[in-house]
């Protein structure tokens, strides 16, 4: 079991009568509570169509059947017909002790698009301050394209946990994805004033690190309110794209096509394109990311963007 505690969290007491043995998921509500779920998916090109050839799950983390909304011949297509998959987590959010692990692999020639049917919610920690964890590993083999496009994450006041995303790209594999995070519930007058969330990103190509980032979000730290850090903003988003044949030209295309605003910026380094949003409008962050993806999609796949139907419900 991964240690999800932060410095200063109370140590786990000895197990007593009625407690579940350590190391497994169980109905317990002390500092050792642990609810694990995992999902492992694999995609492969079979006769010009991307097939989901591996789907293993443990706990309440599954997928709907694959969708194929992009039928039809595309001249000079680099990949097989795309497969759209929706990741389902019926609880709808993470509470203390939850630990989700998602592993996605796209093999050579495959083109997979993954999203979620709704926003992910990060709930307030329990009275013990037990953390949650969500860990995503994306593996892209040479000649494959993976699109990781989850709906936004809503972080409630008092939430404590870690989100990590690891991208392992090989050869000329391509990947585009985003993370949109909204802190607190301003509309309900419930800002994010307590708790601690940490986000980690790591991207490698052929084992070589191209982008690593660790971002702790602690409303009690000066960084959270200082203009040199979060600046008190409640919404942030990061979009990445790796594998573009002309990343600087893609940057210029985004600057030309997206509405000008001081809340977003885009750049590229080491052939990794990064777009950032920092502000207070969740819808604006989502729209910027979606518009950027629609611009980049043809650059990556020779196909126009096909918006998942679930986004429109």
From Swiss-Prot:
GO terms for molecular function: nickel cation binding. It comes from the Bacteria. Its main location: cytoplasm. The keyword Membrane does not apply. The keyword Heme does not apply. Residues 1-30 are annotated as: Disordered. UreD, UreF and UreG form a complex that acts as a GTP-hydrolysis-dependent molecular chaperone, activating the urease apoprotein by helping to assemble the nickel containing metallocenter of UreC. The UreE protein probably delivers the nickel. Required for maturation of urease via the functional incorporation of the urease nickel metallocenter. This is Urease accessory protein UreD. The lineage of its organism: Bacteria, Pseudomonadati, Pseudomonadota, Gammaproteobacteria, Oceanospirillales. The gene is ureD.
